[in-house]
Amino acid sequence: MRRTINLAVIAALIITGASAEVMVSATTVESHTDGKSIGLNLWGENKHYTDDLTVNVSGLGVNGNKYHNNVTGIYALDGSQVAIDKNVNVTVVNPAPAESGEKRRPDLAHYYMSGIYAGYGGVTNDGNNDDTRITVQGNAKVDAIGVGLQANKDGYIRILGGADVKTHPLTTSDTYSALSEEGFVYVNTGMDGLKPGAKNVNMYGNIGFINKNYGIDTNPHNHGSEISLGLTTPNSKLVGGVLNEFDESNNNPHHGGLRLYLQNGATWRNEWLGAEREYPTQGRPDTANYLYTGSKVEHLIGGATEGSRGIIQAVDARPITINNYAGHTAIDYEKGAPAAENGKGEVVINHADPGSSVTLRSSVDALKEHANAEIPGLAENQFVKKIVYNGYTKGERNLGVNVHLETGVISPTLNAKLSPDDFDAAGRAMVSNKTVLSTSESEIVSGAKSALASSVMQMRADTNDLQRRLGDVRLNSDSQGVWGKYIGGKSKITDSAYVNQTYNMAQVGYDTKRGNWIVGGAFLYGINNSDYALGSGSGKTAGLAFYGAKQFNDGRYLDIIAKGNRLKNDFTVHNSLGTSLSGDYRNTGASLSLEYGKRIKRNNGFYIDPSAELILSRLSGESFDARTNTGSTVHINSDAVNSAIGRLGIGIGKEAKNSNVFLKAALAHEFSGKMKATYSMAGEPTTNSVVDLKDTWLDLELGGSWSFRPNTYVYGTFTKNFGSTVDTSYRVDAGIRHNF
């Protein structure tokens, strides 16, 4: 066996005289053999790693007549205490996994191959020890053949940060991303497993709870076996089934099992990976069933609201059983998944907290329904039978059930909202005359509509008044000027469409004095990125502008600007079931803005600035084809969008010889701004969408100009609006002007 530790660590230990059991800095441990191979092999030892820990191991679980060589990254037993202040990275390579030979015993294989193992704590054959504990303050990355995180008797594995645990399904024995055998595994859920954090957690592999009531070293069953996973971010995912031998055998007095926080778009794909666990060759002390009949979860805590719910992707045909349920969760049945078949893929909820709900999502095509989707309630009733609420039979009325059933790509979605009494005597959900049935636009249409709104938002982002474009033009003392400025910000729409857009633009211009007029032109180029409810897009815009600004001797001013823009956007949107639509389109925009105001000077350089502005614009319509990931084509025809925005503003400011600062409030109203589109495709009825931008809102603008040289000044504004359909979270204009 070859085993190495970072030389810098060894040198530090020699210089300081410290013991390796006390404190170690950044460390890399390697163990590579053709048989048994363990990176860190700790029996009753204490280790404290103040920096990152990396463990790389390779070995052979089976070699010759040896069928269970231990190939493990970190192996801690007999009350060992391992503290890792930062991150841990464990890689275990094992081309011949344990128990894969001729004389194999697959029920024991998991003992001999783990990324991180903690066990044999408390009273064992080796004496009375402390609990075995491995605590990682940072993130854990584990790539292992076998089990990712394994906690045996009185062993604790606590990952306080995020985790990326990957196992590799085997055909010779069962494998798990996390396994508990009267031990504890907490990932992103604090020291006690009850405090979900906000880190990304990805677990690729089954979850297991083994009842070691057979063979040697049986567990005393003093407490439950627990695994707590905090999947609380959109980038978090669990892939695998959940085996709980205690529930399978109807003997779980400590109510041990999986506590799963599934929130904020995190996903659990319920699909057993690799070989299922076999019955032990040594036999069990009873005739109860211990084998996997479907995932069983002790606690599932969904989102606090429907908007923050997590997602279960039901793949396995066998039922999911949730003993205690709280919050809100979506359950998706995709086309081709065994769970989508009629009578398969049930979700059984034994108890639900008040105010909790589940939302079933699928398509008529995925469910292989023979029912006519045009008959109200028929398809919904068949689908909703997948929910069994046993708490209902005991008097509970806590679980809400919703249904979203896609009837096509662009065809309307069928919706059902069950009443608290819409369950039969056995607790199976059903559609009744109390159920509220409705239809809504499909998620694909909703996404495409949002993508079309991106261009409208980009046009809106390019609007400006005199101060935002040129700063305080009274600082312009020469006949000609050049200027450049940056425009950046964030805006969003959440009413009738969902777009969250950030944009960055650059504009340069040249102008000259003609009497009391400043006339000139400008070129603009910008990019934007948009997030939709289900999808994303990006865009570019380029434009030319011609303007004239007149300054009157009494403080009045008139600003006129005409602009033409060319916009390009591309997008990909999808629905909850995996169907996506991608397309790109181009628009031409034109606008004319007129602003009239007067700076009324007061004492000590203060002034007030009432103003009125009218912005007229038109964004051309576009007809184009977008394609789905299944090869079909959706034709989209968007109408032109006409806009007329009026603004009445009042500003207060203070001017000095070389500077100006101001605060401006403006009441704005959109008199038009209706965006219409039509969607059509083969085999589905044509559908329409409308986004109405007619609205009234308040703009607040803070800015100023400063002449730091006789012929050069800088200027900038910060803008935010309130109460607008197109909500400007912030906008920053920052520029510099040079006169000559």
Please report, for each region that a protein language model flagged, where it lies by residue.
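Gram-negative bacterial Sec-dependent N-terminal signal peptides
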Residues: M1-E21, G548
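Outer-membrane translocation/initiation segment of Type V secreted surface proteins
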Residues: E21-V22, G327-K344, T359-D511, N587
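Extracellular beta-strand/beta-solenoid scaffold signature
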Residues: T28-W43, N56-G79, P95-T124, D130-R133, ...
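Extracellular beta-strand/loop-rich repeat segments of large surface/secreted proteins
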Residues: N200, Y204, F209-K386
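Repeated loop/turn-to-beta-strand initiation elements of outer-membrane beta-barrel proteins
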Residues: L238, N516-G521, D554-L558, F606, ...
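Outer membrane beta-barrel translocator domains of Type V secretion systems
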Residues: S440-N604, T719, S724, R731, ...
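Solvent-exposed, glycine/polar-rich loop segments of beta-barrel outer-membrane systems
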Residues: S496-T502, A533-G535, K568-R586, S620-N642, ...
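Outer membrane beta-barrel transmembrane domains
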Residues: A545-K550, R602, H635-F740
